[in-house]
Amino acid sequence: MDLFNAAILALIQGITEFLPISSSGHLILTPYLLGWQDQGLVFDIAANSGSLAAVMLYFRREVGQMLRGGWRLLCAPRAWRQANAESHLVLQLALATIPVGLVGLACKDWVATVARDPMIIATTSILFGLLLWWADRQGRCNNDGSALSWRQVGIIGIAQAFALIPGTSRSGVTMTAGLMLGLTREAAARFSFLMAIPVGILAALLDLKDLFAHPMQGDELYFLGVGFCVSGLSAYMVIHGLLAWLKRQTMTPFVVYRVVLGVVIFATLG
């Protein structure tokens, strides 16, 4: 991998991580279509860590609330039954993370091999894109997300598990579930982004053993630094831009992009 490849892949990761168009699908397809060598797990970890840092920085106020809420749950025996707003957010995100954690552990090998097929990416891109369009058009989205029920959180968490299939899009499928449950576009996106924090931390912890097992040299550390910084900066800008966009616009451009991408993959590789 050279510097140009590293910067392009990190830029793709940062842009697509929080747009409802699937970062994993794009990171698989880009080297495949351009004939590049696989970027490797360590680079993926660096780029994903950059995106994680971006969402934590953007929602630093909520991250502070989560830290205080988590500390309260650990230190106060009755906090589990009488959770304040901060503790409630921690419990909500924990519940939403359980399904993807369990499914990820059970299907890790399948996701890392069979599910990376471009035909699967094309299918999920179109299918879940159309579901996003339907959810966005149903017209009942008036919940600002301030009073999500445990049932709603559980449903969004189950939806997130489908994002393990490349091409589905974690942000896309969780926003779709949120819209189906009546959340506004902005509220669905905000909760989806907050859900990315525990999922990203969990994924990073699971990848630590692979990171430590891989001996790194000076040049490789430089590429990893580029991947982290480019991914983080672009992801931060996308989060800000998408939340502003969804205050007044629909999901239609992302749906069109997903369908066109799927059709192009089928036409090119089918």
Swiss-Prot record:
GO CC entries: plasma membrane
UniProt KW keywords: Antibiotic resistance, Cell inner membrane, Cell membrane, Cell shape, Cell wall biogenesis/degradation, Hydrolase, Membrane, Peptidoglycan synthesis, Transmembrane, Transmembrane helix
UniProt topology in membrane: Multi-pass membrane protein
GO terms under biological process: cell wall organization; peptidoglycan biosynthetic process; regulation of cell shape; response to antibiotic
TM segment ranges: 1-21, 39-59, 87-107, 114-134, 147-167, 193-213, 223-243, 250-270
Location of this chain's protein in the cell: Cell inner membrane
Presence of keyword Transmembrane helix: yes
EC number: 3.6.1.27
Catalysis performed (reactions): di-trans,octa-cis-undecaprenyl diphosphate + H2O = di-trans,octa-cis-undecaprenyl phosphate + phosphate + H(+)
Superkingdom of source: Bacteria
GO molecular function terms listed in the Swiss-Prot or TrEMBL record: undecaprenyl-diphosphatase activity
Pfam family, one: BacA
Principal cellular location given in the protein's record: membrane
Family label: Belongs to the UppP family.
More details: Bacitracin is thought to be involved in the inhibition of peptidoglycan synthesis by sequestering undecaprenyl diphosphate, thereby reducing the pool of lipid carrier available.
Main function: Catalyzes the dephosphorylation of undecaprenyl diphosphate (UPP). Confers resistance to bacitracin.
Protein name: Undecaprenyl-diphosphatase
Species: Magnetococcus marinus (strain ATCC BAA-1437 / JCM 17883 / MC-1)
Encoding gene per record: uppP
